[in-house]
Amino acid sequence: MNNNYQGFTEESLCCSFCGKNHLQVLKLITGKSARICNICIHLFNNIVTNIFQEKKIVNYKELEKFPTPHDINQYLSTYVVGQEYVKKTLAVAVYNHYKRLRYQVMNINNNSNLYQDVELSKSNILLIGPTGSGKTLLAQTLARFLDIPFSISDATTLTEAGYVGEDVENVIQKLLQRCDYNIDRAQSGIIYIDEIDKIAKKSENISITRDVSGEGVQQALLKLIEGTVAFIPPKGGRKHPQQEFIQVDTTNILFICGGSFSGLNKIVEERISDNHAIGFHASLKDNNRENLKYSLLNKVEPEDLIKFGLIPEFVGRFPVISILNELKESELVAILKEPKNALIKQYQKLFYTDKVKLEFAESALSAIAKCAMATKSSGARGLRTILENILLDMMYDLPNQNKVTKVVINSDVVFGKSKPLLFYDN
């Protein structure tokens, strides 16, 4: 065998890994400071392949342990009051997402021919509901429960590439951060994008002006949702030509988007009234307006979302649409006291650190719920603001009043008719 190794000593013509010289092997590849023979290349290739297969088997075992829809729903219910249909929808969607991943890994491990030609597509979810109805809380609770990468982003910060704001790839960046830049885990994660209605087109008509936070962002997000290889800057921020990028395949990432879609009910109402001109308007008079708004949203069709300002291709990528209803007074009362981290429990813990017991009469809880319902734009989010206003003076004065042992809040305190009842030591 003539390998043309003129100018090299006998010692330098040996494999750096096994020590065989160039006469004992078929091929010896020489680099700047090391050499490797064809035997070692074949050996190392087998090692890497085995590691990959073992990793797939481990991933499959991890996916086998994934919680059932009942488990997911039960956990959501410990933190989120009401919205039973939405919780069930999310539980099934997340479970099916991981069944889909498990099926893919199972085929790689077992080379099974059963349903081998059947491709399981993603079922991305669109959540529609008023502010304070629990969309973000549901996403945050899911993120805590699932041992998988789960990130939450805000659509209002996203702009087209080249404009002030965040690139759409930042939603993938946040997912990478959640799993310490483990690309394999990120590629099977879940992304929740809040305020998705804020990137609706300003008008159905084509405009000559640039809509940098509307249709352009929808087009850019569409590519990620459909499945593409995204090039992500390693430390976030804008892309620069000289920097290296992390490549993330978004094909298996599940996307959940949420928004209030204010005014969507009117679009649905117009469509239905056009189709049922006689009798429909009469029913408006007979129904409670808030109940009607919720029932209208339950009849939402893709064409309504398109008229609202979402592009058809974007709407088409969300086969699951789930509606969150406005919270009733009884549900707001339950939110105050029942969840694991209920607001009342949080403030009781704060007072407990000052060795003071905080109690709320049932009448006070109902009064707080009534106040929250009066501010229709905030929903459950208004509960904390109301509690802060009620308890502010107490939280300010109590650290200097060592003898106070208990504070009682009733409905008169909530409505500003009296001050909290204080109980003292001895």
UniProtKB/Swiss-Prot annotation:
Keywords: ATP-binding, Chaperone, Metal-binding, Nucleotide-binding, Zinc
Amino acids binding Zn(2+): C15, C18, C37, C40
Residues holding ATP: P130, T131, G132, S133, G134, K135, T136, L137
Domain ClpX-type ZB: 3-56
Stored CDD domains: RecA-like_ClpX
Gene3D superfamilies on file: 1.10.8.60, ClpX chaperone, C4-type zinc finger domain (6.20.220.10), P-loop containing nucleotide triphosphate hydrolases (3.40.50.300)
GO molecular function: ATP binding; ATP hydrolysis activity; ATP-dependent protein folding chaperone; protein dimerization activity; unfolded protein binding; zinc ion binding
Cellular component aspect of the GO annotation: HslUV protease complex
GO biological process, one term: cell division
Family: Belongs to the ClpX chaperone family.
Subunit text: Component of the ClpX-ClpP complex. Forms a hexameric ring that, in the presence of ATP, binds to fourteen ClpP subunits assembled into a disk-like structure with a central cavity, resembling the structure of eukaryotic proteasomes.
PANTHER family listed in its UniProt record: ATP-DEPENDENT CLP PROTEASE ATP-BINDING SUBUNIT CLPX-LIKE, MITOCHONDRIAL (PTHR48102:SF7), ATP-DEPENDENT CLP PROTEASE ATP-BINDING SUBUNIT CLPX-LIKE, MITOCHONDRIAL-RELATED (PTHR48102)
Physiological role: ATP-dependent specificity component of the Clp protease. It directs the protease to specific substrates. Can perform chaperone functions in the absence of ClpP.
Protein name: ATP-dependent Clp protease ATP-binding subunit ClpX
Underlying gene: clpX
